[in-house]
From Swiss-Prot:
Subunit structure: Homodimer.
Residue positions of motif Selectivity filter part_1: 106-110
Classification of source organism: Bacteria, Pseudomonadati, Pseudomonadota, Gammaproteobacteria, Enterobacterales
Keyword entries, A-Z: Antiport, Cell inner membrane, Cell membrane, Chloride, Ion transport, Membrane, Transmembrane, Transmembrane helix, Transport
SUPFAM superfamilies in alphabetical order: Clc chloride channel
Residues in the Cytoplasmic compartment per record: 1-32, 117-123, 167-176, 202-214, 282-287, 439-472
Species name: Klebsiella pneumoniae (strain 342)
UniProt subcellular location: Cell inner membrane
Record field: catalytic activity: 2 chloride(in) + H(+)(out) = 2 chloride(out) + H(+)(in)
Pfam families for the chain: Voltage_CLC
A Gene Ontology molecular function term of the record: voltage-gated chloride channel activity
Keyword Glycosyltransferase: no
Name of the protein described by the UniProt record: H(+)/Cl(-) exchange transporter ClcA
Gene: clcA
HAMAP family in the cross-refs: CLC_ClcA (MF_01128)
Main localization category: membrane
Length: 472
């Protein structure tokens, strides 16, 4: 006797039942399994967006450089074209941010910190396209910005998007997926999973609600984003500096001196960032046309600088291995360092969609290498390697400015694959952090968040005062 085949209606009934079961599981906000499943989804999406963002920025840069190469033999064409192309790309980023999502300007990390405390909105339907396309414009223009800040904000917004799509209503899931997305975004930007975890625990420690569910979710998301990154980009170190020699014990005091140097520079750098932000605020006064034109001028100047001194612009990832290899003299290293300090301050403080992690890593490399090369003739018996000071300097400025020494240490070691330098890294970053704190320096991202919240309160107070007048 022939067995009866299930009818179409039976197939549909089973499919609906399965869909309802999955939906009920996910909507149990207190179920750790549901949070972990969503964390895996968030991490996977953050990894995919991170890879797409990196390749999109590289494509824009290659198209811009390729267009300039076509007219490289005609100086009267290449200089105006370099300015115009970079200016137009930058203006796209500035316009999108100012017109559609002001919170997408700058790094975006303070916005995620504010969102974790439920003090700042997360409008993912606006921020995701604006930050992605705007970042393509500003980074593609050659401005001195990094992609890590945008990736943290994109990742956090992906976390909130997933939460809204699956209608998970518990405050715990709301907070956890936002943090998971931020950690996954940093991991996808640098291929540094442990640094992504530490960044949430250390830098966002006042906002992050640490418990077993949240930390497992962060781990899950970071694992998935790292797997996605390595599928597309391979498992090699993101910054190729080669295997450097370990630092002998009798040279470790030099790394403490280097850390103290960064401990002095870190608070000064933060002060300059904030003052430069105030200057730009006075220049454009909130006017969108002035703001976009100003951004176009900055982008165009970066395009011209890229022709004269390519090492002075861009995120700095290409510069780091060249500088760490000792290919520049001490004088040239210091010149590029000063030039990049100026360009970093201008590009980041203007409110362009882009991060400051990568530019700070490049600054730390330049100053660390210069210190090491200056120390080599002073202490010939030590047989010093300037590259080890470059690696130590990379994390030291991050530690002094952002006040996240653990993140700085692990991030640099993961990016360069030089884990044998962990002891000099610890000494340098700890010295930088302690001295920066002693000098009264405040963490950069926390300070920017406080200023943003103060501005938000002032705007709300102004609206509250204006409302009664309109009603009368």
């Amino acid at each position: 006797m022939k067995a009866e085949t299930p009818s179409f209606e039976a197939h549909q009934f089973v499919r609906v039942r399965r869909g309802d079961a999955v939906r009920r599981l996910i909507q149990r906000d207190k179920t750790p399994l549901a949070v972990l499943l969503m964390a895996a989804v968030v991490g996977t999406l953050a990894g995919l967006v991170g890879v797409a963002f990196e390749k999109s920025v590289n494509w824009v840069q290659n198209q811009r450089i390729g267009a300039l190469a076509q007219v490289a033999d005609h100086w009267y064409l290449v200089w105006p074209l370099a300015f115009i192309l970079s200016a137009l790309l930058a203006m796209v980023g500035y316009f999108l941010v100012r017109r559609f999502a002001p919170e997408a300007g700058g790094s975006g990390i303070p916005e995620i910190e504010g969102a974790l405390e439920e003090l700042r909105p997360v409008r993912w339907w606006r921020v995701l396209p604006v930050k992605f396309i705007g970042g393509m414009g500003t980074l593609g223009a050659g401005m001195v910005l990094g992609r890590e800040g945008p990736m943290v904000q994109l990742g956090g917004n992906i976390g909130r998007m997933v939460l809204d799509i699956f209608r998970m209503r518990s405050p715990e899931a709301r907070h956890t997926l936002l943090a998971t997305g931020a950690a996954s975004g940093l991991s996808a930007a640098f291929n540094a999973p442990l640094a992504g975890i530490l960044f949430i625990i250390e830098e966002m420690r006042p906002q992050f609600r640490y418990n077993l569910i949240s930390i497992k979710a962060v781990f899950t998301g970071v694992i998935m984003s790292s797997i996605v990154f390595r599928i597309f980009n391979g498992e090699a170190a993101i910054i190729e500096v080669g295997k450097l020699s370990n630092a002998p014990v009798n040279t470790l005091w030099l790394y403490l001196v280097l850390g103290m140097l960064f401990g002095c520079f870190g608070p000064l750098f933060n002060f300059l960032v904030l003052r430069t932000q105030d200057i730009f605020q006075r220049i454009h006064g909130g006017n969108i046309k002035t703001w976009v034109l100003m951004g176009g001028v900055i982008g165009g100047i970066c395009g011209l600088l890229g022709l004269m001194q390519p090492s002075a612009v861009g995120g700095g990832f290409n510069l780091i291995p060249i500088a760490a290899a000792g290919n520049f003299s001490v004088g040239l290293l210091l010149f590029i360092f000063i030039a990049r300090v100026v360009t970093t301050l201008i590009c980041f403080s203007s409110g362009a969609p882009g991060g400051i992690f990568a530019p700070m890593l490049a600054l730390g490399t330049l100053l660390g290498t210069a210190f090491g090369m200056a120390a080599i003739p002073l202490f010939p018996a030590y047989h010093l390697d300037a590259g080890t000071f470059a690696i130590a300097g990379m994390g030291a400025l991050l530690a002094a400015s952002v006040r996240a020494p653990l993140t700085g240490i692990v991030l640099v070691l993961e990016m360069t694959d030089n884990y044998q330098l962990i002891l000099p890294m610890i000494i340098t970053c700890l010295g930088a952090t302690l001295l920066a704190q002693f000098l009264g320096g405040k963490p950069l991202y926390s300070t920017i968040l406080q200023r943003t919240l103060a501005k938000q309160e002032a705007e709300q107070a102004a609206k509250a005062q204006q409302a009664p007048r309109e009603n009368t």
